[in-house]
Amino acid sequence: MNKERIIQEFVPGKQVTLAHLIAHPGEELAKKIGVPDAGAIGIMTLTPGETAMIAGDLAMKAADVHIGFLDRFSGALVIYGTVGAVEEALLQTVSGLGRLLNFTLCELTKS
């Protein structure tokens, strides 16, 4: 029996690898993500993973958003709130990580 193996590697460094805004998510998607009735969802992935805790703090201080999911091991962060609040939180979090911690940044994307 052949088993497929997947190896996930992180490169050393400080990086925001994804910052994405989902405006007006469908009911099914929001429910699957675990944030039903969200006007918008923000998704971030960060390296090193522990940065998700700092990003969550920055996001909540930047705008009226809530944390839907945070994983300090994988570096995943999901926030939710209104479209304007989530967009502002993502923008301020990305710029804050660059300014305060000298992270390599990515552009905010939207759908």
Curated annotation (Swiss-Prot):
Pathway: Amine and polyamine degradation; ethanolamine degradation. One of its GO terms (biological process) is generation of precursor metabolites and energy. It is found in: Bacterial microcompartment. Residues 5-103 form the BMC circularly permuted domain. Artificial BMCs can be made in E.coli by expressing eutK, eutL, eutM, eutN, eutS (eutSMNLK) or eutS alone. Cargo proteins can be targeted to both BMCs; beta-galactosidase (lacZ) was active within the BMC, showing the BMC allows passage of substrate into the interior. This can lead to the development of tailored BMCs for specific metabolic reactions. The addition of eutQ to the eutSMNLK construct results in biogenesis of multiple BMCs. Induction: The first gene of the 17-gene eut operon transcribed from a single promoter, induced by ethanolamine and adenosylcobalamin (AdoCbl, vitamin B12). Expressed at low levels following mouse infection, not induced in infected macrophages or in spleen. InterPro entries: BMC_CP, BMC_dom, CcmK-like_sf, EutS/PduU/CutR. SUPFAM superfamilies: CcmK-like. Homohexamer with a central pore; the hexamer is probably bent by about 40 degrees rather that symmetric; bending depends on Gly-39. Interacts with the N-terminus of EutC, targeting it to the interior of the BMC. Interacts with the N-terminus of EutE, targeting it to the interior of the BMC. Adding an N- or C-terminal His-tag to this protein prevents it forming BMCs. One side of the hexamer is concave and lined by hydrophobic residues, the other side has a slightly protruding, 6-stranded beta-barrel. A probably major component of the bacterial microcompartment (BMC) shell dedicated to ethanolamine degradation. Expression of eutK, eutL, eutM, eutN, eutS (eutSMNLK) in E.coli leads to formation of a single BMC; expression of this protein alone can also form BMCs (which may be less tightly closed than eutSMNLK shells). The 'bent' shape of this subunit is required for integration of cargo proteins into these BMCs. Coexpression of eutQ with eutSMNLK permits E.coli to make cells with more than one mobile BMC, as is usual in vivo. This is Bacterial microcompartment shell protein EutS. It comes from Salmonella typhimurium (strain LT2 / SGSC1412 / ATCC 700720). The gene is eutS.
